[in-house]
Amino acid sequence: MIEKIGSKLVEMSIDKHDKIFSITSHLPHLIAYNLVKSAQDFEKQEKYDLIKYSAGGLRDFSRIAASNEIMWRDIFFNNKKNISKAIELFIKNLNSFKKDINSKNNKSILNKLINTKKVRTKIIKLKQDINKPDFGRN
């Protein structure tokens, strides 16, 4: 059944699962919820009709943020230790980007952008193409 929908069954310990998915799934959902909330707060604070001008990025994040809130609350609470560590790492990296932007550190920010772009290439090479129904596995 799992293979029929394009998935692969991988056995791993609960601890390993929770650590991996805290970064690959749980943190991205948390970021999506927070980005949409930030847009909502910005809209109220600045009195701009921000949502009307939502670009592809915000629209993509809002799709994730529209996920089932009860399920995600439970995931966040049940994997709080690993998610908290993932948040700390994210904040550290976000602050590093902020520092580079504020200091106009061209070399550092370009290195970050190039290195993170390589992750997308690796994902595609693993045949995880999100634009295909089976993630490009066939």
Short names for language-model regions:
Residues M1-D60:
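Internal alpha-helical scaffold of NAD(P)-dependent oxidoreductase catalytic cores
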Residues K47-N115:
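Interdomain hinge/lid region at the active-site interface
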Residues K37-Q40, S62, S103-N105, D129:
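Short, surface-exposed, polar/charged, turn-prone segments marking secondary-structure boundaries
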Residues K92, N102, S108-N138:
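Contiguous C-terminal substrate-recognition/catalytic subdomains in enzyme active sites
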Residues S22, H26, L89, N115-K118:
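Charged, amphipathic alpha-helical oligomerization/scaffolding segments
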